[in-house]
Curated annotation (Swiss-Prot):
Gene (name only): ROPGAP5
Gene3D superfamilies: CRIB domain, Rho GTPase activation protein
Record site feature (Arginine finger), residues: 88
Tissues expressing the protein: Expressed in differentiating xylem cells.
Keyword Metal-binding carried by entry: no
UniProt biased composition (Acidic residues): 252-277
Originating species: Arabidopsis thaliana
Source taxon at top rank: Eukaryota
Record region (Disordered): 227-331
Membrane topology, as annotated: Peripheral membrane protein
Subcellular location: Cell membrane
Rho-GAP domain span: 48-225
GO MF annotation terms: GTPase activator activity
One Pfam family linked to the record: RhoGAP
Protein name: Rho GTPase-activating protein 5
Amino acid sequence: MDIGGPTNIRHVAHVTFDRFDGFLGLPSEFEPDVPRKAPSASATVFGVSTESMQLSYDSRGNCVPVILLLLQSRLYDQGGLQAEGVFRITGENSEEEFVREQLNKGIIPDGIDVHCLAGLIKAWFRELPRGVLDPLPSEQVMQCESDEDFVKVVRLLPQTEASLLNWAINLMADVIQFEHVNKMNSRNLALVFAPNMSQMADPLTALMYAVQVMKLLKSLTEKTVREREASSSVVDRRCSKEAEDGEKEKDNEEEEEDEEEEEEEEDEDEDEEEEGDGVYIIKEEEASEIIKVVADEHKSGSIKSEFEGSSATDSKGDNGVVQPPICSSNP
């Protein structure tokens, strides 16, 4: 019986699709046939869902599309925060179309006008298939009156939309920090961003809703600015306290050093006094000995005087030795 070769063979390849890098995991012979970049406007970075875009984290932990981070970085690097009327003044249409084409190819050209960059950020939000605030019940948003109401209602957003809103709010807060230069306060920024955060078919309803969205954005932006200022003041107070503590510690160390020096000087003085007492004692002993010697000398001297006084004459021999007196006999 002849044994034939295997039949009905299948090769299964597990691959991952990435919008920016095509299929990952394909055999190398198939890679040249896979486009590496978005090939047409149908795969543009504008007007598509965030689920089909490459995401990354910003400095505050918001997971947002990379295109927004790139536009934001370029806007900041080119001094867009200081540009007067940023996000209010529109850029040149021809330049915006050119930049759009380059962004679809994954390229960010150099020398883009800051107003064009700001306009593209607004356009990205405006052209989303679903607005950032669309998941919220419009009736509930319209009923908000206080800052606490707005904070509560935005907590109902899904994670993706919440990250996008938080990113936009912090962007506006960054702009407000240079309000004295760019003339853009919280109201002006909320006014230009509000129409791009939701989509409604009825123009009149959309207009009324945009007014409430403007209040929401203004409230959240001002809250963020206040929190930053409070955090900054806390840091400043902490640094000031640390500086004061450092000065106090330094003063204490200097006082301790001065006290130690004084103690050392006192110890030296005491040592000198003790040393002086020792010298005095020694001199006193020497004086006692001298007095004793002198007394002995005086004593021996007085005896000698008496002895000498009792002799009639001093008689010396040839050797100069004192001779005893010669007693004369009585007649």
